[in-house]
């Protein structure tokens, strides 16, 4: 989350795993940002496919998830290397809960994508709270942004439009080119460089605020349960 040329109120690493960073520096002016991230998103899908062999590939997860409207109570916490938000807890672990004999493969696929989307929504919440701003849309790039199913779930859980840019898998390369070329080499400003981007698709929220709040509350409860479990082991209860 870019926050301008003033140093954000929280510097270094905050209590919730949010980082205050210098995003870029041009013309001797620093531009700051707040950053949170989910350590295992695409890598979680690869782990599920390559190590557990539950699905052939990540594309199959997305395709199966698109065939159902919900996970029917199944939740996936993608904390394969711990949690950063809402609390920095490296000892937290991934979990797949709420499974019954009636659970289908498609519902597990949906839960996996929903777990990633919930985690990203937590990051958005943390950034907005610290910066004291309200984001109007989420612009996405990278490999996972190729999943329409994931981006629709993300829009529903974050309550804001999700905009996928053209050639989103080249987002990092495009950002480097914008920074390198926006000092007069190719463009006069970063804003001028950004104006050249082309939108591939926009995913609008389809869930109402009540349904969104219920889903988010259920997810927060699952995260808090895992944090309590990790804390108990930290205190020696698991010995």
Range-by-range predicted roles:
Residues 1-141, 146-239:
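Active-site core segments that coordinate phosphate-bearing ligands/cofactors
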């Amino acid at each position: 989350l870019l926050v301008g040329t003033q140093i954000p109120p929280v510097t270094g690493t905050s209590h919730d795993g949010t980082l205050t960073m210098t995003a870029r520096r041009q013309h001797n002016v620093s531009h700051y940002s707040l950053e949170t991230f989910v350590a295992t998103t695409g890598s979680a899908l690869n782990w599920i496919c390559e190590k557990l062999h539950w699905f052939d590939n990540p594309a199959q997860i997305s395709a199966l998830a698109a065939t159902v409207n919900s996970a029917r109570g199944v939740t996936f916490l993608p904390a394969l290397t711990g949690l950063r938000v809402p609390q920095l807890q490296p000892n937290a672990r991934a979990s797949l809960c709420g499974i019954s004999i009636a659970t289908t493969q498609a519902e597990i696929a949906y839960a996996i994508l929903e777990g990633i989307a919930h985690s990203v929504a937590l990051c958005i919440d943390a950034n907005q709270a610290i910066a004291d701003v309200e984001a109007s849309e989420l612009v996405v790039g990278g490999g996972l942004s190729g999943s329409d199913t994931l981006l629709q779930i993300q829009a529903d859980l974050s309550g804001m439009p999700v905009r996928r840019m053209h050639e989103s898998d080249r987002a990092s390369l495009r950002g480097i080119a914008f920074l390198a070329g926006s000092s007069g080499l190719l463009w006069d400003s970063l804003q001028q460089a950004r104006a050249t981007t082309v939108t591939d698709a926009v995913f609008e929220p389809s869930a109402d605020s009540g349904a969104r709040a219920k889903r988010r509350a259920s997810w927060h409860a699952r995260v808090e349960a895992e944090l309590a479990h990790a804390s108990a082991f930290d205190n020696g209860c698991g010995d």
